[in-house]
Amino acid sequence: QLSSRFVAEGAALGDLDRDGHCDLVAGNVLYRGPAFTDTRRLYDGQPFDPASYSDHFFAFVHDLDGDTWNDVVVIGFPGQDAVWYRNPRTTDGAWTKHLAFRGVDNESPTFTDLDGDGRPELVCMHEDRLGYAKVDWQQ
């Protein structure tokens, strides 16, 4: 058990500090691997009541801006916007928030390569339709 606090419905693994070890993202907390005892905050947030839901359903780790550092995509409560946080490339830097996609409507989106180009798309419901959103890799 990493924490007794309820901060997310789901978590993600990926090397966020480029030390060769997987790190874990759960809610607004980054647990640095391999021991997962050193933590950093990705954004402001508070723990949630375990009898309720959090506003952080899924996270995905991928280099979204092409700088070779993994960033974090966060899918919040169903119907909320998906956002991503740019990796500051330092252990104490601020993770800047960016809009990824408006109104992700289901509880089980995924971030996977659908078109075979080696880059993931966000597969989700949006306005009662199933589809996917592509990252604009030129920006």
Features from the language model and the residues they span:
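Beta-propeller-forming repeat regions
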Residues: Q1-Q139
